[in-house]
Swiss-Prot record:
One of its GO terms (cellular component) is cytosol. Belongs to the FlgD family. It comes from Escherichia coli (strain K12). Residues 11-26 have a biased composition (Low complexity). Required for flagellar hook formation. May act as a scaffolding protein. The keyword Isomerase does not apply. This is Basal-body rod modification protein FlgD. Pfam families: FlgD, FlgD_ig, FLgD_tudor. One of its GO terms (biological process) is bacterial-type flagellum organization.
Length: 231
C-alpha cells in the first residue's frame, strides 16, 4: 500500500474590507461652501473691539480642511477597495481547472472499464493546528462500514494531503463509488483537533455583492478562504 503525501505550511492571506456611509461628491462640496460663507459672514459681523482670536480662526479653517480631507480619503478608500475586489477576482479565476482541498470528508474511487485498469481515488487531507505524533485515517463506505484503516504516522502542523491507493483491508480493490474519511490525531496521548479535507475541481467563479465564490460542480460552491491547498 502506498500513500502520496503533499504538505503545505499554514498561511493566512485573507483580506477584509469594511465600508461605511459618508459625505462624498456634491454633499461635501456644498458643506464646505456653506462653511466658508458662514465664516466670512462671522468675520464681517464680528465686534471690532473683540475680534476673533487667531486660534479660533485656525480651528475653524482646520475644520474646512477636515471636510475636504474626508472626501479625498473616501475616494482613495473606494479606489483601494475596487483594486482589492479586482485582485481577488483575478486570483479566483486563476483557480479554474485546478483541484483544491477544502473542508470535507468525501473520497471518490473509480476504475477504468478496460481489463486490469488501476483504481484511482480523489485525494483526501487533514489540517492540523499543531504537530501530532499519531495520525490515523479511517475510510468507510456508504453504509458506514470500515473498509480501510491507514496509519499515517507523525505529521507537523499545517495542511497535508494524501492519495489512497484504493485497496481494501482484505487486499481487494475498492468498488467504484463514494467513501468517507475520518481523521484521528493525537500527541502524547492527547487527542487533537483534525480537520478532514476533500478534493474538488474548480469549474468556474461566481461574482456577487458579497465577494467571489468558486463553482465546484456537484460539490456546490465555496469561498476563497475555505481553500486550504491548491493541487
Amino acid at each position: 500500500m502506498s500513500i502520496a503525501v503533499t504538505t503545505t505550511d499554514p498561511t493566512n492571506t485573507g483580506v477584509s474590507t469594511t465600508s461605511s456611509s459618508s459625505l462624498t461628491g456634491s454633499n461635501a462640496a456644498d458643506l464646505q461652501s456653506s462653511f466658508l460663507t458662514l465664516l466670512v459672514a462671522q468675520l464681517k459681523n464680528q465686534d471690532p473691539t473683540n475680534p476673533m482670536e487667531n486660534n479660533e480662526l485656525t480651528s475653524q479653517l482646520a475644520q474646512i480642511s477636515t471636510v475636504s480631507g474626508i472626501e479625498k480619503l473616501n475616494t482613495t478608500l473606494g479606489s483601494i477597495s475596487g483594486q482589492i475586489d479586482n485582485s481577488q477576482s483575478l486570483q479566483a479565476s486563476n483557480l479554474i481547472g485546478h483541484g483544491v482541498m477544502i473542508p470535507g470528508t468525501t473520497v471518490l474511487a473509480g476504475t477504468g472499464s478496460e481489463e486490469g485498469a488501476v483504481t484511482t481515488t480523489t485525494p483526501f487531507g487533514v489540517e492540523l493546528q499543531q504537530a501530532a505524533d499519531k495520525v490515523t485515517a479511517t475510510i468507510t463506505d456508504k453504509n458506514g462500514a470500515v473498509v480501510r484503516t491507514i496509519d499515517i504516522g507523525e505529521l507537523t502542523a499545517g495542511v497535508h494531503s494524501f492519495t489512497w491507493d484504493g485497496t481494501l483491508t482484505d487486499g481487494s480493490t475498492a468498488p467504484n463509488g463514494s467513501y468517507n474519511v475520518a481523521i484521528s490525531a493525537s500527541n502524547g496521548g492527547t487527542q487533537l483537533v483534525a480537520q478532514p479535507l476533500q478534493f474538488a475541481l474548480v469549474q468556474g467563479v461566481i461574482r456577487g455583492n458579497s465577494g467571489n465564490t468558486l463553482d465546484l460542480g456537484t460539490y456546490g460552491t465555496t469561498t476563497l478562504d475555505e481553500v486550504r491547498q491548491i493541487i
